[in-house]
Amino acid sequence: MPDRSPEYITGWLEKNLHRMDNPSQFLGTEPGAARKPWDQVSVRWLVAASWPYYHSTGNQSIPAVCATINNGRDDFYADRFYLPETPRDLRSLERAGIPVFGIESRHQARDFDALGTSISYAVLWMNFTKMIKLSGIPLRWRDRESDPGTYPMLVAGGQAYCAPGFMEPVADCIFLGEVEDEPGNGGLSQVNARIAQFKAEGSWCADRIGCYERLAREFNYLFFPRFVQTFYRYEDRGLPEPSKQVAGYAALLDGMRMPFRSRTVKNLDNIAPLTQAPLLYADPRMGAGDLEVGRGCDAWCSFCRLGWVTNPPRERSVAKSVEHAKAWQRNMGSTELSPFSPDFPMHRQKKRLLAALLENVNSSLDVTAMRIDDFNADDQYVLIQAHAGADGVTFGVEGTSARMRDLVGKGTTDDDVVEAVTRGIRAGFRKFKLFMICDLPGEETGDVMKIVDLGRRLAAVRAELGQPNVVFQMSFTPLLIEAATPFQWFRPTPLDYTLIKVAEEFRDLGIQFKIGTKAEPNKIALFQLCQRASRDVGEAITDVFEELGTACWGGVPKDARERLEAALVRHGFRNGLADCFDERYRGDLFGWEYISTGVSQDQLWEVYRQMVEFLEGTDPDTYEQQFSGPSGGAEWLPRCDQQCRGNACGVCDGEDLKLRAARIRSSDADIDLARVKVIDQDSVALKVRARIEVPERNRYVTREHWKYAIRRAAYLAQDGLEWKTGIAKKTVQLASEVCRHRDWACGTDYAEFGLTWHPPGGELPMFIDNMCAELAPWLLLTAWDVFPPGASMRQDAGLALWDLEVAASPDEVAARLRDFAASDYVKLVIRSDSAYFGAGNEEVNARDWVSDLWLTRRGHTYTLRMLISAKAGPYAMYAAVMGKPSWIEAAARPAIRRGLFTGSPAGGSGQPDLLRPECEGCGETVPAGLLNEMYAAPGGGDFCPRCADEAAGSVVAALTPSSLV
């Protein structure tokens, strides 16, 4: 991969962004983006988010936290890069030789001091390795040993740190635990300070390995794989060949402490929460945030690593949480917050916290993932949840039968589930998702079929309460045996296809059935192998990722399992996956035991031993008769509701909380957006008016919300327009005036504002030329941002982007509108009774995420309107504004060739006769089978593809406004 300068990368983006599926992902000009002089910072990080979903995921979680920590100091800088959202965008970068780069600084990855990512599960590592290759950086740290100072330090962190074996061949450093700075407890900034010191000494480039040695000795939560060696031995495990097992570990660096220990923030009130992030243009949530109120879990479920390695549970105080929510609203202009699901049920004052957020911040809270024991414990808490804005709730039932739930320590009976659903329906919830873990060790067909009996009881409750529209969904996912849990000694259970029978039963009961994507055999095999990976297993996984040479957007290649088998054999695992998936014994060493998670192996083994005894002494057919009570036979594992947490209800005095009526339901919002009218050839009146009407009027919306939303919309417009064009000065000024103006009104269900602007006479042509490409997206952003929390559009709904009324000559109107309509990102539907634009409807170049763009005529006034589907969000908007003169020429030629316009400016021949098989250019008769290849050229008449292409080339200049050339 050749070196690419920031100027080269910027130039390529300007020429090619309009061809990307998600161009806004690479802009880096959003409000909240970090921009610092490159030469004035001492440590530069590139934080790469490898999520295979919308890049908003990486904007609000650990990558955003890391960026915030670095950018909080003047001498540190963190840029960002996101995995392209589609394979086509990734291929575009790869074919053009564009490396991974900071989207704000436009510097390539190799220019940074550190390249970091957060890994929560295995597939994300596959994506990160692809980004490393795209950056032109050798994949394995051994291949970087000859000249490590020329490459950034590759750092991995996240939840996968407990079993980092699959990352060891690649990562220079693995950050164990939590990164936030805490007084007296170090953090990421302390590591950065050391890197700055090394750079000042000149050793960061000249003696990079020496710098790594100094970091490894000082910070016990930084694990450098090059300084630890893993030993293996072969044992007879009853497999066809001797099994390769871990025999021990050795430190290769004097003064380095082993085992390594994960870092934990002791008091969440001591660290600053995430209160601001870049406002992503392409994020449909537009500023919605995540609210962290706690960390850790006191449930101690035997399958879940979260409950074992993140303890003790810690929580943020009510006052700090409310302060966090207010800061997010102030900075981001959105009151939509989603508390992290595992955190809220654990909070000792969850009822008071929820009430405080609703009362003081008026947030639209999605507190949908709940524990059944908490849900059943307090009717008032259930009602407060219903006020929070969601119409559905998710229950973690976990096991398919009471026996399986007792095995994992959940202790939930079918009666508990039915009671929770009954309470929820009476409180107003209408959607219930029950999350199940299947394929647990010891699970039998009888356990699986027990869930059908539960489904029948739920259907009966729905009928008894007279709520036929209540939706139930049973969601199943196979067990992933995680490291550092009591389950780590079990052999992974093969997928049990008994669930197919369950699906048929649920269909008859009117209950939705869903199996998670991890159930795909190749994917679960990869996930499970990464959880059990030692150093050499990681080498095999890296080989496979390198062979595949691609990223993962949800699925895993079909031949991944076969490739893993072959790679394991090459690295000495003669039985392939069987060596890794075999049952473990007490004396076995796991591939991660050089890391201390705070939970001893003796404690985990004792729980495992009791689980084995429990399975041997029970069976699904007689279990409910053998044991009574909610805890069943799981006496060996303390249950959450049996542990005193001070006051389980969360409210010290149990006072009756009074809330405003704030019940939110999904509804459609009608938007009447804007109108632009050219009065004459010297002036234009622009009336920008956004009005949102929510049919359900019992939603209380504060005046402050509308003010934040409108101000943010105008800020977005100003920032975006200023970056994109240097000639639309007055349009930028317009956005600035909206930031300052006071001509707006609001109510509980609407907000509107208006502004009239009269440009000087000489600027009218320029204004018309740029109105389509610049003003339209600003108006859409305005409408998108003032959407009230809780209001939503149907998937097939659209919103009117803008109307343009021009009292001018038809030739001038046609020239202006054709320029905009020549985009490959829209479809044009010409609807008019005028022969000038053709009769009837003609759809050309449809995109499934764009609705309609149509033109109507009354006398000499033409109205152009675009409808953009809710599915698209601001995607299509940015596709329309990325235009430069070179883009207009490139887009106009194929658009004309396909017959985007019919007729001619002078009147022409009107709608072409598609049944005539002769080309008017060359006179050649076109075979009947190719009639659909006939085209209408701008001069009128029908042409074959070759002649139409030549005709298109002759009119490109006419379609390009002179002010843009």
Walk through the language-model features, giving the residues of each.
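Cysteine-cluster motifs in flexible loop/terminal segments that predominantly coordinate metals
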Residues: 298-304, 584-676
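Glycine-rich beta-alpha loop elements in corrinoid/cobalamin-binding modules
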Residues: 83-251, 483-533, 541-556, 773, ...
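Acidic, glycine-rich segments characteristic of secretory precursors and extracytoplasmic regions
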Residues: 1-168, 203, 731-740, 805-807
